[in-house]
Amino acid sequence: MSELTIGILGGGQLGSLLCLGAKKLNINTVIYCDDKDAPAQNYANAFIFGDYKDEIKIKDFINKVDIVTYEFENIPFETLDLINQFKEVKPKPAINKIVQHRLYEKDFINKCNIGTARYVSIKEKSDLNSNIKLIPGILKTCRLGYDGKGQYKLNNPSDIENLNIDFSQEYILEKMINLKKEFSIILTRFGH
């Protein structure tokens, strides 16, 4: 039996793959997920169903694991920060705060001298009219958008008038570019 137990927040496809990989290395896994039907529970050594903001269940989870990771970026920052006070969270919560907000993520990538499509923060409909030069473009929610959710294609300026969206949340408008290929890349480092 393994001496190491990894706690995984989220129970989807990536959590399932992580559990399968850990099993090959004789590492135990505990899944914590807000979906009682999460597929990763079928591959984990243990499964805890609960809301990501339920401190009692989160503390129970903390007591069962040695280190914690997460399989998707929309885990509340406060939850990761709480866990990190007791067990190491990888990637660090501060990283997650960046990747779960599209504008922070783009700004961070640009500060690393990596090019992106042109973009601008949109807080109200008039901001769209002030940034016509970025149309055609994609208007995206800054938070909680994935797989096309929270995205609105603007082919021409007249599409702005037809938008029926809630401007109580922040958006990002990205200039459409002609892609030849799209890659998803994960970088990691071990140690310092």
Language-model regions, residue ranges each:
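Active-site nucleotide/adenylate-binding loops and adjacent lid/helix of ATP-dependent enzymes
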Residues: I98-H192
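ATP-binding N-terminal substructure of ATP-dependent carboxylate-amine bond-forming enzymes
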Residues: M1-Q100, Y104
